UniProtKB/Swiss-Prot annotation:
Swiss-Prot/TrEMBL GO biological process terms: intracellular calcium ion homeostasis; monoatomic cation transport; regulation of G0 to G1 transition
GO MF: monoatomic cation transmembrane transporter activity
A Pfam family assignment: Na_Ca_ex
Subcellular location: Membrane
Protein's name in the database: Protein ECM27
Family per similarity comment: Belongs to the Ca(2+):cation antiporter (CaCA) (TC 2.A.19) family.
Coiled coil regions in record: none
Gene Ontology CC, one term: endoplasmic reticulum
Sorted UniProt keywords: Membrane, Transmembrane, Transmembrane helix, Transport
């Protein structure tokens, strides 16, 4: 356990760090792996589990007694969208929370400065770099923004402007107070209420938009789109038939035909016969069904049959060749080897022959069965624990290296984060039977044991404290309870499927119906319990990885003599924003799957607005939600922020160790000013005067380059301020 604690906490691993090759190379590798694992935790485990547990339809079995109504799905869709947006930004949120929660009374000012710098850096990258990249990509396509889309994006821009004004006030006051955090949390909550209400009132789509979405689902996206980025865990893959507008119902990562299956299917189609079935081929197939004869007569009969067929005779006409055989030339029909001749002494040679026969037969079939079982087991292991290696031969060198490196981490995540599928239980109305999928059930039994014990182990590593043996009684009891629950579930399914000869009276049918309802409720309860355990475990994993990154940044800050503010504005912000950049760019490229011009324009507009709205939502979540929630929890419940004052008077200064007292941190102010300028530019593009909008729309590529250059200039100014301060 000590080695795991040292690896997870760089301050313990690098006790005397210096700028040397022996420190820089492993530390940079440490940072890259931590960022990649954060993306894997969020996209592969946390997001799918939250999407599954928040959708009642996905918790029901196939053939459930409760119908999956569309109205219920639309009612929960908005809540699911909010939860999934929170999950996609979970690395930023948890790194923000950990920088506050792990502070001491001496380091709280620098830790909060790192948090504010990371948030402002992430907001600037998302609004300037990501939005600018979107504008550059969409500059080649004509877009038509509707009035509802314009009002929606204008509302989000105004909320983002208000959020940046609050951040500017905090930077000018050079402190964060409890009242500031309350205001931020209230502003984000009000944003959610307005957004959900507005979405519900204007969620109806035109028939043209619906037709375009249907056409998009029919025209599948290539399964190899951005495969190199998906393998690193930074990008949730864009799958075939991935409908963005309805992605919540299908989960974050809809299943797709793997590369191996796709290539096998393609080769099967290429190798199939493209010729028309002529008479000779059909006659040859008919002849193979007849009794075998010696080779010379068989070839003669096939020739005669072919000539008769070519003359226009029907295929069913018997050929003369079969009447030419003499008895001596008939095919020999021998009995099987087990039908041995009669012997007076059965213990004589019969036993020896039988043993030889059984040994040969059993040896052949046993080896074949073992090969088949090993191949099937290998397929199960790849499918369950290392699915990102299924198309390993088609990965680039860098992706293959990262895929191999992350294999042990992915296996540990899989063992600690149960993900029961929605189709674990299905009902066949014709047979009145339930069927269980074997592989997920086996995996749930394994995770029933591993997940509780890994939970205690992760907590021990995160707290850098060896838990007592009595603490491990809790995971032991929990594991036994989960195993008993699964066993009872399987037993009830088998009892329901048991054949009975009872009469189907009304009372018996009603009793069967009640048992079905209880069985389906048990299925739903099992899914919720395992999903909740998975969410708790993966949140602790994300907290551990985020804390490791923060400790690594603190080491570099001490070695280089840099402030935590500039580290948060640059390295930390870029590391947590790469995933947003890649996913939004890939989303914009989806319009290329449509060939019809009008559908192409409509889909391009739709994905453009989705990308812009997701960027603004990320800004609101990181700034108001992240700082507001983290600051409020820390200043109310963590002793390092308690200066024996009333709770509403508590505050923390944004003070670096190299700064004088009450000196403003101009890097924060510069960042806020440039972000506000970017928001004003977006307001002019979407809601400015018509002549300005037309000019900006024509020069979208130039506008996108200007947006990227805006944040590049802000970063340059911040670096100069850091160097000369």
């Amino acid at each position: 356990m000590d080695w795991a604690i040292n690896v997870a906490h760089p301050r313990l691993l690098y006790k005397d760090p210096k700028l040397s090759v022996t420190f820089i190379v492993p530390s940079l590798f440490h940072i890259i792996i931590a960022f990649v694992l954060l993306g894997i935790c969020a996209s592969d485990f946390l997001c799918p589990n939250v999407a599954h547990i928040s959708d009642p339809n996905s918790l029901r079995s196939n053939g459930s007694l409760v119908s999956k109504t569309a109205s219920h799905a639309s009612h929960t869709g908005a809540l699911m969208a909010v939860l999934l947006s929170w999950c996609n930004s979970s690395p930023d949120l948890f790194s923000n929370l950990m920088s506050w929660a792990t502070s001491t009374r001496e380091t709280r000012s620098t830790s909060v400065s790192l948090s504010i710098g990371e948030v402002l850096g992430a907001c600037g990258i998302i609004l300037c770099i990501v939005e600018g990249s979107i504008f550059i990509i969409m500059s080649r396509t004509h877009i038509e923004i509707s009035q509802i889309q314009k009002l929606s994006i204008m509302r989000d821009l105004l909320f983002s402007l208000a959020a940046m004004c609050v951040m500017s006030y905090v930077s000018l006051m050079n402190q964060v107070t409890v009242l500031n955090c309350l205001l931020m949390a209230f502003l984000y909550a009000f944003y959610l209420v307005v957004k959900l209400t507005f979405k519900l009132n204007h969620s109806a789509e035109t028939p043209d938009e619906t037709a375009a979405d249907t056409s998009l689902r029919e025209n599948s996206v290539s399964p190899f789109l951005d495969d190199s980025l998906m393998a690193s865990g930074l990008l949730p893959p864009i799958q075939p038939g991935f409908d963005i507008s309805n992605s919540i119902t299908h989960g974050i990562k809809p299943s797709l035909l793997s590369a191996m299956d796709f290539n096998s299917f393609l080769s099967m189609l290429e190798n199939s016969s493209l010729e028309e079935d002529d008479s000779r081929n059909e006659m040859a197939e008919l002849n193979t069904l007849r009794s075998m004869t010696p080779g010379q007569h068989w070839s003669a009969s096939a020739t005669v049959a072919g000539e008769a067929t070519s003359a226009g005779r029907p295929f069913s006409e018997p050929t003369n060749a079969f009447t030419e055989y003499r008895d001596s030339e008939r095919a020999i029909n021998s009995s099987p080897a087990v039908f041995a001749p009669y012997r007076d002494n059965p213990d004589d040679e019969e036993s020896q022959e039988q043993v030889l026969l059984e040994t040969t037969t059993h040896g052949h079939f046993g080896a074949q069965e073992m090969r088949r079982f090993s191949k099937r087991s290998l397929g199960w292991i790849i499918k369950i624990f290392i699915p990102h290696l299924s198309n390993f031969s088609q990965k680039s060198i860098s992706d293959a290296i990262f895929s191999i490196i992350t294999v042990p981490f992915f296996i540990i995540f899989k063992l600690s984060c149960p993900q029961p599928p929605s189709d674990i239980l299905s009902y066949d109305p014709t047979l009145n039977r339930y069927s269980l999928t074997t592989l997920p059930i086996i995996l749930l039994f394994i995770q029933s044991i591993t997940a509780p014990f890994l939970l205690c182990s992760i907590l021990s590593v995160l707290l850098t404290y060896h838990l007592g043996y009595l603490v491990y009684l809790f995971p032991l009891i929990l594991a036994m309870a989960l195993i008993l629950l699964l066993t009872a579930f399987i037993t009830k399914v088998n009892l329901h499927n048991k054949f009975t000869l009872s009469l189907d009276s009304s009372n018996i049918l009603q009793e069967k119906l009640q048992k079905r309802k209880l069985l389906e409720r048990l299925n739903t309860s099992i899914q919720i319990i395992f999903l909740a355990i998975g969410i708790i475990n993966i949140i602790i994993w994300i907290s551990l990885l985020a804390n490791s990154l923060i400790e690594m940044m603190e080491i570099y800050q001490k070695i280089l003599g840099l402030s935590k503010a500039i580290l948060g504005l640059t390295i930390f912000a870029w590391g947590n924003s790469v995933g947003d950049l890649i996913s939004n760019i890939s989303m914009c490229r989806l319009y290329k799957t449509q060939t019809h011009y009008q559908d192409r324009v409509r889909l391009a507009t739709k994905f453009f607005m989705i990308s812009c709205a997701s960027c603004l939502g990320g800004v609101m979540l990181n700034s108001m939600g992240g700082i507001g929630f983290s600051g409020l929890v820390s200043m109310l419940f963590i002793g390092a922020f308690n200066d024996n004052e009333w709770w509403f008077l508590r505050k923390v200064k944004l003070q670096e160790t190299s700064q004088l007292d009450n000196t403003l941190n101009y890097k924060f102010i510069v960042s806020c000013v440039f972000i506000i300028l970017q928001i004003i530019l977006l307001l002019l593009f979407f809601g400015g005067p018509n002549n300005i909008k037309r000019r900006l729309t024509k020069e979208m590529k130039l506008v996108g380059i200007s947006m990227c250059g805006l944040w590049a200039l802000a970063t340059l100014i911040n670096i100069l301020l850091e160097l000369f301060s």
